[in-house]
Amino acid sequence: MSREANPFKKMPTILMPDELMAKALRRGEKVANEMRQKELPWLLKARFVEEHKVRTIASVVADNLQKVIDKTPPVRKLPKFYQEMVEVLVGIDDFKKSMGAFKWASELVRKLGNEYARKIRKARTPQQAGKLRKEFVGRVKSILEQIHPEMAFVAVAREKLKDLPTFKDLPTVVIAGYPNVGKSTLLKKLTGADVEINSYPFTTKGINVGYIGEIQMVDTPGLLDRPLYERNDIELQAILALNYLANLILFIIDASEFCGYTIEEQINLLKEIKDLFKAPIVVAINKIDLVDEERVKEIEEKLKEVGIEEILKISADKDIGLDELKERLKKIAIKEFLKDKDAENKELEC
């Protein structure tokens, strides 16, 4: 499945039992009024009116529930990133169980509609036809009340899931590093265009997305910018979900320390991210125009000591080293993207 759009954007508004029943009864009454205009024998007309009422109510309720099913993607067929988001935000098992309740109710209401329509056709009096229709309405109300908790759950889930960020199915670089190290400036300089801002769970700042040709660059303010011990379990899961998005991590170090964090603190965060993500890491030492060469060499040595091999020296502000960085990111991200796609295809074949 393509990641061209958030797969939950098309989920329709979830009507609660009273709302859905009111809608169905209004539609049923409208159809009944049309039927009452027909010139028919009184018993035949009574059957005709009540049968069409029942069929209309059944159709409105069953179709509405089925529409929710049809417009909601099967979770297990989603890209891993979105599967993780469903698990973090609402729980996959609870979500699937609730969608199952919609299916059960839709099928049962449709079946009952057909059964009661047949019974009404055989009614011996208008009163009997009306009684059967009322009985049917009562059973539909009971079914909807039975799945009320699941309807409420899916309504809340929809609100959370429809605002998930939209990512394209492209080689993706996720940018990390402490606040004020130059991530936003670098993203704008590398992509050379307006940056899209997407919402993301557990951060009020949103996710910034830009593109270098066919490379997707994702900046995550509020997520990969502080130590993991400051996170709760759900925030950690939201961060871990990025594992399924990132083909490459670009970690920014502020050589000047003007960001307010020492080199040691920045490298400690880098080590945490290195342990957390399976994607390779490129480190860009930023603001090299503000420190001497000796200081940059010291930082390079410290990075090599923690196992970082891909190190580039840049100044996002002064446009130093950005072309080389851009080319390295493209080359590595595309290579890793193709490798990940190959692994996904092999997984599907098994």
Swiss-Prot record:
GO molecular function annotations of the record: GTP binding; GTPase activity
Superkingdom, natural source: Archaea
Coiled coil region boundaries: none
Positions contributing to GTP binding: 177-184, 219-223, 286-289
OBG-type G domain ranges (all copies): 171-334
Classification via InterPro entries: G_OBG (IPR031167), GTP-bd (IPR006073), NOG1_N (IPR041623), NOG1_Rossman_fold_dom (IPR010674), P-loop_NTPase (IPR027417), Small_GTP-bd (IPR005225)
Keywords (A to Z) from UniProt: GTP-binding, Nucleotide-binding
Listed NCBIfam families: small_GTP
Family indicated by similarity: Belongs to the TRAFAC class OBG-HflX-like GTPase superfamily. OBG GTPase family. NOG subfamily.
Protein name: Uncharacterized protein MJ1408
Taxon lineage: Archaea, Methanobacteriati, Methanobacteriota, Methanomada group, Methanococci
